[in-house]
Amino acid sequence: MAATPAFRGSFTALVTPFKNGSLDEEAFRKLVNWQIAEGTTGLVPVGTTGESPTLSHDEHHKVVEWCVEEAKGRVPVIAGAGSNSTTEAVELAKHAEKAGADAVLVVTPYYNKPTQEGMYLHFKAINDAIGIPIIIYNIPPRSVVDMSVDTMSRLYELQNIVGVKDATANLGRVSQQRHAMGPDFIQLSGEDMTALAYMAAGGHGCISVVSNVAPKACSDLMAAVFKGDYAGALKIQDRLVPLHDAVFKEPGVSGAKHGLTLLGRIQEEVRLPLIPVSAPTGQAIRSAMIHAGLLN
């Protein structure tokens, strides 16, 4: 396990803005700066929310480079480097390290359903290829496989494995992983709705989709938790619950992009097979943003 930067607080799983079918570099760089100004404590480009499945390798590389350049060391950048091909994941991780990312986020291999040993060897190959921290992304609903606590514990013995983004929706895993790996194993919630409860059980932060739209509120919630002000955090959560619901009525990427479009920060474009949100979902997002104090 490597020495790690301060991977705690509110991390935004950044959307990737498009304009006329191409990457919108200007909008992306402005989004990075706005996120930091609003209090976001870390950035995660080219994950699922960044539409990594529909980016070319060249586009993937560019977005990581732009994020690192624009962040200028003000907050850590955890670059998405996941694939169900170990060779491809190694290549993406090597590029992220070369670009100056502080860490990589690597999803458990999806669709091809590896065994626990296959997952271990996949992450070990990435560990052996780079020298920056690796955060496991465990998301059984999308990957179909669930990395066991035992496999995670074995991986934590390696030099660069430092933590997990946990989207199991099983709050018991926080305590089980803390017991197995200890309090220094970084645990980041991957579920906006349950992030507050995750933190109360021993989490270190959240990699959030909703913080694309509500970065200050998400950051303030984490800050309240770190101060032990759970009553204050709950008040913020009460404002955000309708937005958590609305953004995920359809794929969260489309929901987050719709919210950012309402704020005038990006164009709503997504790439097929994703499509923009329907009119009823769009109205639900608008209403939730008004409830959260993000729109008048």
UniProtKB/Swiss-Prot annotation:
Per the record, where is site Part of a proton relay during catalysis? Answer: T48, Y111
Q: Which PROSITE patterns match?
A: DHDPS_1 (PS00665), DHDPS_2 (PS00666)
> Pfam families, per this entry?
DHDPS (PF00701)
Q: Which CDD domains match?
A: DHDPS
Q: Which key words tag this protein in UniProt?
A: Amino-acid biosynthesis, Cytoplasm, Diaminopimelate biosynthesis, Lyase, Lysine biosynthesis, Schiff base
Residues at the catalytic site: Y137, K165
Q: Which residues cross the membrane?
A: none
Cellular component, GO, one term: cytosol
Its subcellular locations are: Cytoplasm
The record's section on Gene3D superfamilies has: Aldolase class I (3.20.20.70)
Quote the catalytic activity from the record. L-aspartate 4-semialdehyde + pyruvate = (2S,4S)-4-hydroxy-2,3,4,5-tetrahydrodipicolinate + H2O + H(+)
Output the SMART domains linked to this UniProt entry.
Answer: DHDPS
Q: List GO BP terms, alphabetically.
A: diaminopimelate biosynthetic process; lysine biosynthetic process via diaminopimelate
GO molecular function of the protein, one example? 4-hydroxy-tetrahydrodipicolinate synthase activity
EC number(s) per UniProt? 4.3.3.7
Show the InterPro entries listed in the entry: Aldolase_TIM, DapA, DapA-like, Schiff_base-form_aldolases_AS, Schiff_base-form_aldolases_CS
State whether it acts alone or in a complex, and with which partners, per the record.
Homotetramer; dimer of dimers.
Q: What does this protein do?
A: Catalyzes the condensation of (S)-aspartate-beta-semialdehyde [(S)-ASA] and pyruvate to 4-hydroxy-tetrahydrodipicolinate (HTPA).
Q: What is this protein called?
A: 4-hydroxy-tetrahydrodipicolinate synthase
The record lists the organism as Rhodopseudomonas palustris (strain BisA53)
